[in-house]
Amino acid sequence: RELKGRVIVADPTTDLALVKIEGDDFPAMPIGDSDKLKVGEWVLAVGNPFNLGSTVTAGIVSAKARGLGANGVESFIQTDAAINQGNSGGALVNVKGELVGINSVLSSPTGAYAGYGFAIPTSIMTKVVADLKQYGTVQRALLGIKGASLGSSIMEDQSPIDKSGTTLRDKAKEFGVVDGVWVREIVDNGSAAGADIKVDDVIVGLD
């Protein structure tokens, strides 16, 4: 059957929304715990690729907590189940029939499926939905700094970070630390500014 839906509120960062549908007796897919997924576990991707309705493809979980810099999500489920144009918003389901992710993006130089698909895990989805219901927007933490990682690997890094030719290795030696985050910029009205963190501070731990 076909029913009309009305968007109540949406989160543009994750491209998720609350949609109200008038009707009753709707079957509901059980929501699984995406945190319990294991790499190599079988999953099914359901969607509408190329207007081929209710298409199901199968694959495995290729990786977890994959960061792409896309959609503001840094914890995608990566799968080789075919995800193409039109799959976005469809279900990623485990072998128990539980929803474990929302199909989101594919990674391909041509725009067609190349073996790399990504889904937003239910651990993020449930948080987004709860916040949209309660606040009408998603509550996100913002540290309020722009920084650079200081670690053992940068001791070999000779890339200049400013016009004077200073490198991260130079900075690490200057600070006398081998692990931490060097604060390069403070965002106005952010949490860091309110906590009196300054440019050139080095964050070495969190309470």
Model-assigned labels for residue ranges:
Residues D200:
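Conserved catalytic motifs of ABC-family nucleotide-binding domains
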